[in-house]
């Protein structure tokens, strides 16, 4: 790294030399992330169980360090409030005086048992950005459309006035009306369907089509084009490849192709990094920091690369440098790096510094004491400039506008007022979901499931968002997908095999509601052994319905146990509609969330798609775990 080290003191950014002790390096390797629920090994095949464990506990961890569970979805899938659209001013313009007791009052929400949400799903009836996203080529999209509706380019959103004139889609409209024709620009720049006031996330299928159609860009003489392709491949591979390796390991052709493209992308990034391309050095440092793709973790080298990248003008490296220092416990120095990034209008630095201020972490640091309003201003700046690398500013911005962001200081003590603004929150959720934020995708799935924030109920859009979130490891999304396939809807056929598969995935990840649903599915088919097992798993997490069901089973007259059900014997739609009202549906609001518990060992049952499949050496568990540590997106 001599060439990189020589660049450290050239830039006015003034990134200093820094050396880590071996103890510091070990501390930094444990970068904080959302603590997902533990997963047990109820699948008898240890290889399959370990792959599922790696998928949920590694890949689905938050891509942004320090994004804790406090920033996760504030409520369960059924706990969405029923809002009216609010045309209040923007967040920073709305900071006014108010009484302390009125600030951040919790909305009155109802309990969300799995049975209630199933019933609600079956009874539902469908009735600009100011600037381009940073770090993405600003080429004009070349994709064309076959209808006359005005196009909206992904990455740009209509203003509130434009959105008001949008007619929401009829059921025959298709949500994946994308044109995979290569245009030397990533799918984030392509045209999308314009029957929504914001673009839907680009599907995995189209992203893969774009990678295939443009794989020659890796050899492009245009460094920007080649680097954009390499960056996009790493982002897509980070979320999609672990999913394939975990649940579709028989798809060796696609797995091998993505691994090959990932190797090409890493080679190209390393090549440009050695040529002192600032952006390439950032991604190269990221690989060394995380130990991704079988690259041995080297924190000191990552620091050197980040420093050189920052001194060459790539301000996102300042965010990573600050994160490393903050994780080491050196908060004051970390803040200095975040402040430098803020001065360059870096979205990630604005986001992190805003949360430090709003959470009161800097109350004892000079100028930040009792200046929490500045945190709100920084959060809005972060939302305005968010990109696919760090979209978390948008998600936090949405939660603050809904008064759902936990862990913040009492802003009312400073007479700071933030009115609830559901229209702004919806826009921020949608933008974050488009940029790949899994929790935002989960929330948008609920928006279209229940018709919240002024949106209509559109089952297929709900399923689209939930499916995207499920592929990124959101167990609540797997449960929601299972409900849609259990009941079906306009445009969604009943598919009990898929419903069972998604419910089992969420159950294996420790989701208590999914475990209860699994127990109910087996219970209605007379499989007492399996039903008892899953009710017990849910009951361990305090699930009240599961506890009641266990008591009922114990009081029943013992009868011969029927054969274990198979994937073709799941309960039909009529059975689900006859589910009785349970205690949680009449429980008071604000009931504490049911915690997730690991699954131990289930009685034998026929396998679903998660089965033992021989995989080549380079898709082994070792590669998967290291790959899943990559948090590029």
Swiss-Prot record:
Q: What is its main location?
A: cytoplasm
GO biological process terms held by the UniProt record: fungal-type cell wall beta-glucan biosynthetic process; fungal-type cell wall organization; mitotic division septum assembly
Phosphoserine sites (modified residues): 148
SUPFAM superfamilies attached to this UniProt entry: HCP-like (SSF81901)
Which stretches are transmembrane? none
Localization per Swiss-Prot or TrEMBL: Cytoplasm
- Give the Sel1-like repeat ranges: 278-314, 315-346, 438-474, 475-511, 512-543
Q: Where is this region: Disordered?
A: 121-151, 583-613
Q: Which domain of life is it from?
A: Eukaryota
Query: Where does the record place Low complexity bias?
Result: 592-613
Q: Does the UniProt entry include the keyword Glycoprotein?
A: no
GO CC, any one term: cell division site
Enumerate the UniProt keywords alphabetically. Cell cycle, Cell division, Cytoplasm, Phosphoprotein, Repeat, Septation
Keyword flag Cell division: yes
- Give start-end positions of Polar residues composition bias: 136-149
Show the Pfam families listed in the entry: Sel1, TPR_8
Q: Which InterPro entries match?
A: Chitin_Synth_Reg, Sel1-like, TPR-like_helical_dom_sf, TPR_rpt
So what does this one do? Involved in septum formation. Required for the proper localization of chs2 at the septum.
**Record protein name field:** Chitin synthase regulatory factor 4
The primary gene name is: chr4
């Amino acid at each position: 790294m001599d060439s990189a080290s020589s660049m450290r003191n050239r830039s006015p950014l003034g990134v200093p030399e820094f050396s880590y002790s071996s103890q510091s390096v070990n501390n930094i390797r444990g970068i904080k992330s959302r603590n997902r629920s533990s997963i047990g090994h109820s699948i008898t095949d240890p290889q399959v169980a370990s792959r599922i464990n790696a998928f949920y506990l590694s890949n689905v961890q938050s891509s942004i360090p320090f994004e804790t569970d406090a920033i996760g979805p504030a409520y369960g899938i059924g706990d969405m409030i029923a809002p009216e659209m609010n045309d209040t001013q923007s967040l920073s313009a709305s900071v006014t005086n108010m009484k302390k007791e009125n600030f951040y009052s919790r909305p009155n929400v109802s309990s969300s048992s799995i049975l209630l949400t199933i019933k609600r799903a079956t009874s539902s009836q469908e009735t600009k950005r100011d600037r381009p996203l940073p770090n993405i080529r600003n080429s004009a999209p070349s994709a064309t459309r076959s209808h006359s509706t005005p196009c909206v380019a992904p990455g740009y959103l209509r203003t509130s006035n434009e959105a008001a004139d949008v007619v929401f889609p009829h059921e025959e409209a298709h949500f994946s009306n994308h044109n995979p024709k290569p245009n030397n620009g990533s799918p984030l720049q392509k045209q999308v369907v314009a029957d929504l006031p914001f673009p839907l996330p680009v599907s995995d299928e189209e992203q893969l089509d774009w990678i295939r159609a443009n794989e020659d860009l890796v050899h492009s003489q245009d460094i920007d084009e080649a680097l954009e392709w390499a960056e996009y491949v790493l982002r897509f591979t980070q979320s999609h490849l672990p999913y394939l390796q975990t649940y579709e390991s028989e798809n060796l052709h696609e797995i091998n192709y993505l691994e090959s493209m990932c190797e090409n992308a890493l080679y190209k990034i390393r090549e440009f990094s050695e040529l002192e391309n600032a952006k390439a050095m950032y991604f190269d440092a990221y690989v060394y920091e995380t130990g991704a793709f079988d690259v041995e973790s080297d924190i000191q080298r990552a620091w050197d690369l980040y420093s050189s990248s920052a001194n060459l003008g790539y301000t996102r490296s300042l965010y990573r440098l600050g994160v490393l220092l903050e994780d080491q416990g050196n908060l004051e120095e970390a803040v200095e790096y975040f402040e430098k990034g803020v001065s360059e209008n870096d979205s990630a630095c604005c986001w992190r510094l805003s949360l430090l201020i709003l959470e009161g972490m800097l109350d004892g640091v000079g100028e930040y004491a009792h200046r929490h309003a500045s945190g709100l201003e920084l959060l809005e700046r972060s939302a305005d400039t968010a990109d696919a690398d760090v979209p978390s500013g948008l998600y936090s911005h949405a939660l603050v506008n809904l008064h759902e962001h936990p862990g913040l200081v009492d802003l009312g003590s400073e007479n700071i007022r933030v009115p609830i603004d559901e229209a702004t929150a919806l826009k921020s959720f949608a933008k974050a979901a488009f940029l790949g934020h899994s929790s935002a995708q989960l929330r948008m799935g609920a928006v279209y499931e229940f018709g919240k924030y002024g949106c209509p109920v559109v089952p297929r859009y709900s399923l689209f968002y939930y499916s995207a979130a499920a592929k990124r490891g959101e167990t609540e999304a797997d449960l929601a997908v299972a409900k849609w396939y259990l009941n079906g809807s306009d445009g969604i056929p009943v598919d009990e095999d898929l419903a069972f598969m998604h419910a089992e995935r969420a159950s294996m990840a420790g989701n208590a509601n999914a475990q209860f649903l699994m127990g109910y599915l087996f219970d209605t088919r007379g499989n007492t052994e399996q039903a008892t097992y899953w009710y017990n798993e849910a009951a361990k997490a305090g699930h009240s319905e599961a506890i009641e069901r266990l008591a009922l089973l114990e009081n029943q007259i013992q009868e011969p146990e029927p054969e274990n059900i198979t994937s073709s014997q799941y309960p039909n739609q009529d059975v689900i509609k006859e589910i009785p009202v349970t205690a949680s549906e009449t429980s008071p609001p604000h009931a504490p969330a049911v915690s997730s518990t690991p699954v131990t060992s289930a009685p034998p049952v026929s396998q679903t798609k998660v089965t033992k499949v021989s995989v080549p050496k380079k898709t082994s568990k070792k590669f998967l775990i290291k790959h899943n540590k990559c948090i590029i997106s």
